[in-house]
């Protein structure tokens, strides 16, 4: 205040005012400030000052031949004076106006293609809707966000190669375009840009925008997908927010969203299979998202989410070094700890073996709706500062931090037994047992935690066990803050290892991720996800399992047929029949399997009773571990459409319907494909199955009489030879074996021998 009074005094004296307004600016320090260095110190002033001059622009000399000296109003467009220090002409801003109105027209066809990202942005904004402005405190946290909607996901190096190939195809330099996306984009762009007159440098810049993901570390309070980030300056300020719905979606956001859904589905499914890691890899390699291989997307896409990171770890890719617990991403910011096993007793006197973090550590915790700073010592929470969108989100963060602290009062707050299991019915590890327990009900935990008096600190407030805010008291060590905690900014990636149960560890052996951390949230993917793996058939429900199982048998009938006769056990154990078992009532699965296997064995033994349709229809039932019983069935039940439906052992039913005339199979009215051979030929294509017990000697030999049908063969005595007519109308010479022991190998060699005999 004193200073201001003093200045007012000075200004009231006329002499002061005169000095300040009239003195020339020729002070050395000032001249130095504004003239040293290439950097313009006051760009807007410079611009205004330049534009006030008559000829502020310089142009190439050739312009004088293309633009008249004066315009229609008689104003001079360019000066005869040369620009000092260059051989360019000085030009008036009016010349630009003249050029825009009267200059040569060029084709504009390439502009929307080159400036695609800009044109699309305009469309999105045109169709977007801006809602009301709300004034409220904004809890922004810095997150790494994608600022460039509509891009492909190439690495900088891959993009550079594509750009060089498109813009400067004849330049020398090693360019290897390897990935599918690189080749597709290059081909597409070369076609689009034929005869393009836009400067190559501009084209290169714009291509880079289209091909590479650009991320920035920005304070965000709302949506983080790129179509929200491009309007960040319009939707949130320090104390206000404006509602906004984007007027269009972009593929990169859709890819990110669909990738997360696919990864979650795959991790959840793999976790319950016999070999989770192998299953996970098989599914990642056979899945496509929006027509692109999932593994290609995983290699290029930087999305960090628990399930996505587990898939990346399985593929041997690097992932972020932060770890996940209770849906929060933890990043240690200081301190260190060693791990040791310790046995603890819950409030229910159940013994738990936990891995204790021994030492002082500080962490940031970042979740979807809440963030926190946690300081802890060995089995003790020292301080937790939480901020979140609402009471519920804040409570979630507090529970996770309390469990993570491993404090005794938390373990003693357990009421009842801990016996939570994962999807595969295996017990969860103790830390996740505790977490699940308190996520269900945290009342006792909060009540037993203890409360303390608090000092008033700017921006901080206390929180009571019932989650109400307070300025006097708070749960011990816990405070709520108005300010969010920034996400971990470094994009550093580390080498990790993964075990067969999908637990991901860093090189020190700390567990970063496990299937328990994968969110159960279900969403609808924006892009089509095609899971080719049989493990994912059940994702669309029982009907899909039924149709897919039979489609698989029909598609692979040639190999299935041979295995059916030669190595049935191997066939029954195929993973493609696994999903089907969930449709068969549990109590009767074993009996069905025993019945079908016996039936199949009779088919193999009694010649000529082979029936393709029946084998296809009953095969999936034979996959369950068989129970021996004398039960016979005329129909088998499957649980689809919410009730049991019957498949007839002999004949068609709504579930399984084979049309002999069209050779088409329909399952529950859905087309399941065409059989390439006619099941009525009884013998067609399965000589290997039927000729067990016979040795194929070669081509037809007339000395052994006319050709018999396969059914007549059973009358031969051991060692007797005969010509036999096989499925395709060919005749071969066979001999009935003297010993039964070698019957199994017959069917394996039969197929080969028949081919040789015929050819």
UniProtKB/Swiss-Prot annotation:
Keywords assigned by UniProt, alphabetized: Cap snatching, Eukaryotic host gene expression shutoff by virus, Eukaryotic host transcription shutoff by virus, Host gene expression shutoff by virus, Host mitochondrion, Host nucleus, Host-virus interaction, Inhibition of host innate immune response by virus, Inhibition of host MAVS by virus, Inhibition of host RLR pathway by virus, Inhibition of host RNA polymerase II by virus, mRNA capping, mRNA processing, Viral immunoevasion, Viral transcription, Virion
Any one of the GO CC terms: virion component
Subcellular location: Virion; Host nucleus; Host mitochondrion
Coarse class of the protein's main subcellular location: virion
A molecular-function term among this protein's GO annotations: RNA binding
Site (Mammalian adaptation): 627
Protein's UniProt keywords contain Amino-acid biosynthesis: no
Motif range (Nuclear localization signal): 736-739
A GO BP annotation: symbiont-mediated suppression of host gene expression
SUPFAM superfamilies in the record: PB2 C-terminal domain-like (SSF160453)
Cited Pfam families: Flu_PB2_1st, Flu_PB2_2nd, Flu_PB2_3rd, Flu_PB2_4th, Flu_PB2_5th, Flu_PB2_6th, Flu_PB2_7th
InterPro entries, sorted: Flu_PB2_2nd, Flu_PB2_6th, Flu_PB2_C, Flu_PB2_CAP-bd, Flu_PB2_middle, Flu_PB2_N, INV_PB2, PB2_helical
Role description: Plays an essential role in transcription initiation and cap-stealing mechanism, in which cellular capped pre-mRNAs are used to generate primers for viral transcription. Recognizes and binds the 7-methylguanosine-containing cap of the target pre-RNA which is subsequently cleaved after 10-13 nucleotides by the viral protein PA. Plays a role in the initiation of the viral genome replication and modulates the activity of the ribonucleoprotein (RNP) complex.
HAMAP family associated with the record: INV_PB2
Assembly behavior: Influenza RNA polymerase is composed of three subunits: PB1, PB2 and PA. Interacts (via N-terminus) with PB1 (via C-terminus). Interacts with nucleoprotein NP (via N-terminus). Interacts (via N-terminus) with host MAVS (via N-terminus); this interaction inhibits host innate immune response.
Family: Belongs to the influenza viruses PB2 family.
The protein's name: Polymerase basic protein 2
Organism: Influenza A virus (strain A/Hickox/1940 H1N1)
Gene that this polypeptide is encoded by: PB2
């Amino acid at each position: 205040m004193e200073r201001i009074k003093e200045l007012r005094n000075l200004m009231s004296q006329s002499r002061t005012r005169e000095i300040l307004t009239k003195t020339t600016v020729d002070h050395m320090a000032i001249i130095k400030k504004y003239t040293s260095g290439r950097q313009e110190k006051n760009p807007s002033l410079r611009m205004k000052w330049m534009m006030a001059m008559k000829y502020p622009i310089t142009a190439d000399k050739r312009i004088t031949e293309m633009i008249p000296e004066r315009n229609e109003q008689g104003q001079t467009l360019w000066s005869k004076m040369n620009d000092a220090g260059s051989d360019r002409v000085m030009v008036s801003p009016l010349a630009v106006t003249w050029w825009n109105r009267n200059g040569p027209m060029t084709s504009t066809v390439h502009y929307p293609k080159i400036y695609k990202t800009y044109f699309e942005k305009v469309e999105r904004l045109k169709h977007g809707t801006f809602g009301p402005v709300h004034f409220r405190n904004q809890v922004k946290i810095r997150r790494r966000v994608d600022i460039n909607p509509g891009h492909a996901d190439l690495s900088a190096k891959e993009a550079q190669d594509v750009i060089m190939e498109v813009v400067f195809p004849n330049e020398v330099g090693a360019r290897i375009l390897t990935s599918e996306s690189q080749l597709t984009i290059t081909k597409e762009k070369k076609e689009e840009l034929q005869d393009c007159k836009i400067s190559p440098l501009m084209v290169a810049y714009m291509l880079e925008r289209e091909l590479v993901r650009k991320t920035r570390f920005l304070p965000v309070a709302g949506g983080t997908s790129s179509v929200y980030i491009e309007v960040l300056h319009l939707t949130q300020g320090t104390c206000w927010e404006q509602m906004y719905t984007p007027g269009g979606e972009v593929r990169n956001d859709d890819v990110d969203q669909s990738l997360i859904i696919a990864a979650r589905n795959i991790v959840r499914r793999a976790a319950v299979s016999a070999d989770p890691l192998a299953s996970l890899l098989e599914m990642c390699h056979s899945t496509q998202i929006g027509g692109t291989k999932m593994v290609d997307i995983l290699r290029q896409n930087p999305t960090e989410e628990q399930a996505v990171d587990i898939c990346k770890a399985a593929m041997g890719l690097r992932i972020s070094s932060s770890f996940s617990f209770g849906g929060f991403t933890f990043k240690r910011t200081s301190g260190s700890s060693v791990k040791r096993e310790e046995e603890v007793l819950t409030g229910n006197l159940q013994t738990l073996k936990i891995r204790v973090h021994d030492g002082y550590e500080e962490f940031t915790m970042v979740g979807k709706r809440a963030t926190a700073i946690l300081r802890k010592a060995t089995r003790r929470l020292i301080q937790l500062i939480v901020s979140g969108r609402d009471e519920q989100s804040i409570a979630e963060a507090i529970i996770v931090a309390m469990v993570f602290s491993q404090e005794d009062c938390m373990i003693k707050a357990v009421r009842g037994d801990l016996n939570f299991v994962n999807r595969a019915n295996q017990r969860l590890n103790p830390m996740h047992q505790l977490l699940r327990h308190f996520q269900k009900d945290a009342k006792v935990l909060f009540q037993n935690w203890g409360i303390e008096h608090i000092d008033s600190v700017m921006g901080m407030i206390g929180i009571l066990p019932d989650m109400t805010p307070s300025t006097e008291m708070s749960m011990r060590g816990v405070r709520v803050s108005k300010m969010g905690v920034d996400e971990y900014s470094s994009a550093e990636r580390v080498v990790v290892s993964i075990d067969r149960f999908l637990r991901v560890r860093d090189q020190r052996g700390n567990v970063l991720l496990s299937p328990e951390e994968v969110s159960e949230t279900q969403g609808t993917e924006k892009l089509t996800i095609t899971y080719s793996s049989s493990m994912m058939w059940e994702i669309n429900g029982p009907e899909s399992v039924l149709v897919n199982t039979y489609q698989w048998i029909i598609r692979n009938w040639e190999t299935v047929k041979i295995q059916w006769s030669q190595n049935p056990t191997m066939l029954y154990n195929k993973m493609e029949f696994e999903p089907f078992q969930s449709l068969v009532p549990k109590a009767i699965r074993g009996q069905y399997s025993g019945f079908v296997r016996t039936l199949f064995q009779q088919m193999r033994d009694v010649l000529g009773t082979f029936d393709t349709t029946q084998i296809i229809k009953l095969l999936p039932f034979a996959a369950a571990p068989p129970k021996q019983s004398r039960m016979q069935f005329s129909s088998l039940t499957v649980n689809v459409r919410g009730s049991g439906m019957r498949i007839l052992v002999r004949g068609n039913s709504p579930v399984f319907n084979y049309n002999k005339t069209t050779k088409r199979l329909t399952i529950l009215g859905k087309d399941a494909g065409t059989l390439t051979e006619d099941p009525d030929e009884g013998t067609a294509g399965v000589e290997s199955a039927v000729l067990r017990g016979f040795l194929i000697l070669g081509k037809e030999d007339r000395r052994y009489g006319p050709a018999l049908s396969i059914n007549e063969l059973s009358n031969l005595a051991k060692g007797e030879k005969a010509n036999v007519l096989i499925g395709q109308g060919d005749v071969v010479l066979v001999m009935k074996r003297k010993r039964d022991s070698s019957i199994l190998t017959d069917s394996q060699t039969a197929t080969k021998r028949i081919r040789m005999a015929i050819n």
